[in-house]
């Protein structure tokens, strides 16, 4: 028979272990506590203002790209569509936003032709160039090139990170472009288990 102190120690360890395990269990990059990546309002592909604050209670996933992107944007959106499928019914509590870095060409009409092809629940966002630049700065997203200028290159170089906000609206995770869908689903499920703030 175990002594009382041993039982108490085992009980304390059992209580602490889940908290420690969950804290260290993210497979993406944990950026919890950063002072950037705040709320913003842009225009959706349906022509309506959309604020990220409206998605409190959901896990919010953001990707910055553009519809004429020749490489990572399409595959990344396809990967995020696969993520929603893998989440099954839990996908109802996940919202994915595609924020253009090419507002000159990516009008609401252009986004409407592009974004819902990957998943009808995705929302494409655009705005004035200065609005997009401000949001990109706040999320540490770099992009170069201006296709509206004839001398500019036909493509825009941009960051490929995927940003994940928790149900309370705080930026919590970064996924690299090559992060497997299974790892994304694992982390999103952890965030979905957290209490609403």
Where on the chain are the PLM-derived regions?
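Hydrophobic beta-strand anchors of alpha/beta hydrolase catalytic cores
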Residues: 61-62, 96, 162
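N-terminal export leaders
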Residues: 3-8, 12
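Structural microenvironment flanking redox-active thiols in thiol-disulfide oxidoreductases
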Residues: 75-135
């Amino acid at each position: 028979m175990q002594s009382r102190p041993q039982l108490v120690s085992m009980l304390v360890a059992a209580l602490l272990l889940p908290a420690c395990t969950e804290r260290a269990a993210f497979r993406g990059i944990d950026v919890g506590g950063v002072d950037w990546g705040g709320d913003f309002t842009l225009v959706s592909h349906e022509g309506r203002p959309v604020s990220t604050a409206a998605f409190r209670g959901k896990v919010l996933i953001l990707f910055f790209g553009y519809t004429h992107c020749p490489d990572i944007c399409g595959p990344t959106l396809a990967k995020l569509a696969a993520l929603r499928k893998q989440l099954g019914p839990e996908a109802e509590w996940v919202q994915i936003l595609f924020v253009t870095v090419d507002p000159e060409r990516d009008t609401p009409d252009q986004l409407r032709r592009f974004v819902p092809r990957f998943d009808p629940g995705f929302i494409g966002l655009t705005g004035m160039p200065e609005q997009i630049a401000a949001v990109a700065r706040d999320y540490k997203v770099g992009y170069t090139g201006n296709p509206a200028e004839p001398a500019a290159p036909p493509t825009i170089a941009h960051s490929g990170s995927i940003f994940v906000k928790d149900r309370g609206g705080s930026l919590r995770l970064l996924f690299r472009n090559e992060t497997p869908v299974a790892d994304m689903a694992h982390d999103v499920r952890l965030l979905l288990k957290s209490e609403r703030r």
